[in-house]
């Protein structure tokens, strides 16, 4: 199971890629494999504020609906509109095509509190 080293991870199975003051957020390969085939993705709007620990959307699979929890706080600056028409990207390419939102980071310390790839791998038993 892929756990890219350059990303940070939340205990709720979101990944975070930091570029300057913008964080790209998605769900991990482990999360999508547990959910099964993704059929619908609900995401916030551009300019919405999201807060660490709060839900910012959901992912619906053939098995269940799972909430998405914000690993950091900030303002949504971009949403991956392609997931509306192609939710299967979450299964096919969780770290590339299936990024969900880009957020302007409001508190850098929240990034430091996230898990490293090594710690996340330990958590999921990889």
Curated annotation (Swiss-Prot):
Please give the family membership noted in the entry.
Belongs to the GcvH family.
Q: Which residues carry this modification: N6-lipoyllysine?
A: 63
| Protein name as annotated | Glycine cleavage system H protein
Q: Does the keyword Thylakoid apply?
A: no
Work out whether the entry's keyword set contains Translocase: no
Instruction: Enumerate the cofactors the protein uses.
Output: (R)-lipoate
Quaternary structure?
Answer: The glycine cleavage system is composed of four proteins: P, T, L and H.
Record's keyword terms, sorted: Lipoyl
Q: Which organism is it from?
A: Staphylococcus aureus (strain MSSA476)
What are the annotated GO cellular component locations? cytosol; glycine cleavage complex
Q: Which residues form the Lipoyl-binding domain?
A: 22-104
Q: Which GO terms describe its biological process?
A: glycine decarboxylation via glycine cleavage system
Q: How is the cofactor bound?
A: Binds 1 lipoyl cofactor covalently.
Q: What does this protein do?
A: The glycine cleavage system catalyzes the degradation of glycine. The H protein shuttles the methylamine group of glycine from the P protein to the T protein.
What PROSITE patterns does UniProt report for this protein, alphabetically?
Answer: BIOTINYL_LIPOYL, LIPOYL
